[in-house]
């Protein structure tokens, strides 16, 4: 399945059904009076977060979603039925923006979350509603209220507890495959990973979701190499595991390049808790390993972890460091106040 993390859709709620002009006609009742019912309300447009989806690919082939109109009112004071709703199903992590691409309407973070995007129009009143002491037989009814319509932009930012960041070919996919059941494409060339991937890590009777973010290059915050798309997925991660390839020419420079991209992108990426690790340690001789660790320590301002996903060296230590950071984040999240919901 192709990975699609942005889509533009058109939504329209249903018009309300028109009211009915009707009079009671019954034997021996000369002045039966008005009995026209009201029209039904138009259907709403909802967006719903569901299990089992991890891409917005469905919205590449269908962009228009319209709820049904309300039914007409009828005689004998029968009101019209409400129109059927239209429901957009999206994966967790989807954000809904107005057409300008900046106004956030909804942030779908949990399975089962449901937000109304467009409210259906009210049904029109039938002539029975307009009966007064001076007008006992009104001959008019209301048309239904029009529904709402708008263009929306859907953006998917994968929700993960921890994210793997680094330059291309830093060993992120190998690490993900080692610690989870995920099976990302792995090869010895840059940009093997073209789409973000998720896996569930189970360590010390605990579990968390780990995201493999495609490699970043210089200029990623400006969209070079689709970097701005990839960085958007990092926004959702609570902790970053920054892998620096041990076989690179200079581990310190490689680390600083990625840090510059995180800072330039903004959105608080540079402020996220970060665990720094030197990867592919099994491919280095002792002297080279010592030099690369020293360079990375100077650049990062702290001693990095040393790991090799291929041999298993340092992997459990890295997982425990991630879990410790997540435990600290959980304590901070308990004091956060919920955001005010959006209403159409």
Swiss-Prot record:
EC number(s) in its UniProt entry? 3.6.5.-
Signal peptide: which range, if any? none
Report the residue ranges that make up the Obg domain in this protein: 1-159
Report if keyword Nucleotidyltransferase is assigned. Answer: no
Compartmental location: Cytoplasm
Annotated Gene Ontology MF terms? GTP binding; GTPase activity; magnesium ion binding
Query: Locate the OBG-type G domain: which residues?
Result: 160-327
GO cellular component assignments: cytoplasm
- What residue ranges carry the coiled-coil annotation? none
Residues that coordinate or bind GTP = 166-173, 191-195, 212-215, 279-282, 308-310
For biological process, the GO terms are: ribosome biogenesis
- Protein's name according to its UniProt entry: GTPase Obg
The organism named in the record is: Methylorubrum populi (strain ATCC BAA-705 / NCIMB 13946 / BJ001) (Methylobacterium populi)
